Amino acid sequence: MSVGLGSSGTGVSDAWGRLVLTVGFLAVAAGTVVAWQTPATAYEVSIYAATPLPFWIGASIGFLSAAVVTLRSCRDRVAGLAVVLGLVTTVTIGALPVVRSYRFYGRADPMSHLGWATEMLAGRMSFGDVFYPGGHSTTALLTDAMGVPIERGMLLVAALYFALYVVFIPLIAKALSGNRELTVIAAFSGFMVLPVNQISNGLFFHTYSMAMWFFPVFLYALVKHIRSEPAVDSITDAVMSDLADGPILDAVGAWNVVLAVLGVTLILIHPQVALNVIILLGTLVVLHAVVCRWFDLFVSDLRPVYGVFVFIALCWLVWIFQFDQVFSVGERVAVSTYEAILGTAEAGESVETRAESAQSVDASIAELFVKLFLVPSVYIALGFLMFVYTLWRSFQDADKRHLSADVDPLSRSVVTYFGYAGLVLGPFFIAHFMGPISHLFFRHYGFGMMFAIVLGAAAIHRIGVVIPEGWMKAAKPLALGLLAVALALSLLTVFTSPYIYNATHHVNDQHIDGFDTAIEHRAEDIQWSGIRNGPGREFDALVPGTVRQNRPDVIGGASTYNESELQSLLSGASDEVMYLPVSQIDVDREVIAYREVRYSEESLRRIGAQPGVHHVQSNGGFDLYYVTPRANGSDPAGVSD
């Protein structure tokens, strides 16, 4: 997998490399044009299968061209162009919902965020009404400036955040060591999009996910700051320097200011990610102030982060105490952890539930682990080994001020810092693995993978350095093969699909327009049902003033969860009339993605044939049924054809 095994002495000409990259760029461009000209016209249960084959061929050629060029040489400008090619290819794949002109992407939380962004754009909701307004306000601004629909604006904003991740992962490695080979390895590691796990994050408008994608920008600034030359030694010196000599920016340092701005930005995108950052900075403060200075366990000439830690922590406290939900989430974490310690609650309930669901469709846990977590696990292991190796070398060096020349002392200290930060963040993340909130653990897993990617890339680079020169010729094809396998395994799961026994988060025109019409013409006192889930998210997105806490009572508590409950509803067992919306999303999800484990295709297709079930609305991808109790022979009312 190492793309840094080559050297500038391999004899490859710039002309040859540029020719290969030209082919790669043209292939990616041609594939993207084909995908752009083939927009989605109906619900797509798999974005992989629905996207035209020429796009995937072009993307494969793009990655192959970039990998071949960087394997030959990582130390010239052509290698930089190869990284750009890989970056463009990765961003294009991540932005496929935009390229394919999806109406919207994201079935759960993103639908609620769509409603909030719409409210903010219309002026019915203010910036301070939302716990995490950063993404919504950016969307409102972008939508208003570009004149695009709000759904389109949200897709563009989500793609923009993802692009920041792809760009800044290699920049972190470059800031860490300045080594071009390590930078290239980190770039290709970032192309694998390892933070996505399809349990609690993804490539859609999800505020935690977007903050997670933004975090590498902060991490890059943090590395640049702690490796920079301090102008002063303390905050007191900074103030005195300002009074005596010049502007406070010169005294405090530009990177301190950048970190403060980025920290506040993270708070506004999602305060939970900002809390992770505060814990990270707090760990660095302890390491610098206590471990390094008092115990002298390892050398650190790195610049401290005292001021920015205090500033971001204070801003975080001021922001979160305006909202009640932070207390409820904190209480759930504390209670779940306490119950798990006492043995009254099981850890990983969300994981257990998903495992049972996977087994119900004949999917093994081993299969899902390979598809979702094999490559990330390799990087986690490599990152941990890199931390242990770096710490061991620091202890082994008798003269801590003159470390071995094979690794830059400052880079070694940064790696050690990150390793210790991971050890501190680990228990905090594991606390979220307890009880019914275990799904939150996989949010933090994505955050932690940012460190694993950088440290894992450093470990791969170290392996490449110690490989004997005589083995290089055989190692390069092996590295190319491992890279191809890792990219394929990883990129096949950046979107949900039947490949991982799930359906894509595509929300098509027929679904939104169908619900919009049904909601507009509804009778407000009639209860809504649903297939597996009710229409709560659709109400969030489409009904002005609706948020999750203020949904109408008629849209909750009446959904069917399996075929027997559906048949009970259709047979008139309920004592009141019901609206039953069924979209193509429901049918394809249950039949194709979930292998009819809860609902059979026949039962879903024959809903309208049941006595007392009236088919009152259809648009080719959405159907609305009016279900009457058998004792009530009333005609359909409340929704027109």
Walk through the language-model features, giving the residues of each.
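Membrane-embedded helix bundles of polyisoprenyl
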Residues: G86-I93, A140, D144, A158-P247, ...
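Transmembrane catalytic cores of multi-pass membrane glycosyltransferases
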Residues: N201-T207, A211, V232-V257, V261-A381
